[in-house]
């Protein structure tokens, strides 16, 4: 099992690494931050790496050996947490899944409605990759609640070559086919044409809404 330093959503090694990384931040926090301050302070990843590259006496009388033992213990604890979370079969430890890294967009009314209505309002879950330390930041939690939901790549030489991504759709009406029509593209890190000229727009027109004043 080889980890290629990519948090691919279809990767089991990526799932193991993220469990280790999360455990690492917890353990370094427990080691370095006084107990009375642990609700207020956390050690960031850059500082964590610096502490591991130049270990001090907090790791024990032999800091290098203590650091190595600390990392091995952290890995074992991370794997144990994954086993408890996803079961003993390592094939089930794939990173991108509903029980691990995913994107579920919860409607503001989601908690107040029936399960049937909630299924209409919420969008997802869709498997995701990455985390808060990767390009295309997808956040540090299991459910992606941070990161870009909209991106646009504008070609100022030819505006009709502009590309975009957005989520979850183009309508706020859950009964509309456009309510979540862009979500899968976004979750797959794919883009769509964002046409500019009238001819191009009308060539892919879904519907026209005409609003006429009553008087």
Please report, for each region that a protein language model flagged, where it lies by residue.
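C-terminal/peripheral segments of proteins
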Residues: 1-215
């Amino acid at each position: 099992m080889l980890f290629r330093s990519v948090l691919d959503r279809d990767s089991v090694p990526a799932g193991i690494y993220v469990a280790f990384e999360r455990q690492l931040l917890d353990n370094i926090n427990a080691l370095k931050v006084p107990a009375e301050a642990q609700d207020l302070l956390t050690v960031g990843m850059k500082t964590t790496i610096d502490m591991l590259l130049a270990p001090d006496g907090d790791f024990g009388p032999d800091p290098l050996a203590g650091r190595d033992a600390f990392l091995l213990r952290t890995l074992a604890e991370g794997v144990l947490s994954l086993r408890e979370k996803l079961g003993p079969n390592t094939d089930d430890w794939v990173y991108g899944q509903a029980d691990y890294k995913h994107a579920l967009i919860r409607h503001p009314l989601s908690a107040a409605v029936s399960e049937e209505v909630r299924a209409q309002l919420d969008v997802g879950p869709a498997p995701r990759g990455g985390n808060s330390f990767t390009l295309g930041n997808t956040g540090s939690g299991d459910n992606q609640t941070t990161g870009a939901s909209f991106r646009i790549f504008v070609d100022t030489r030819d505006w009709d070559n502009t590309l975009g991504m957005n989520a979850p759709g183009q309508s706020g009406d859950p009964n509309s086919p456009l309510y979540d029509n862009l979500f899968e593209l976004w979750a797959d890190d794919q883009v769509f044409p964002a046409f500019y000229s009238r001819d191009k727009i009308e060539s892919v027109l879904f519907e026209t809404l005409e609003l006429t004043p009553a008087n």
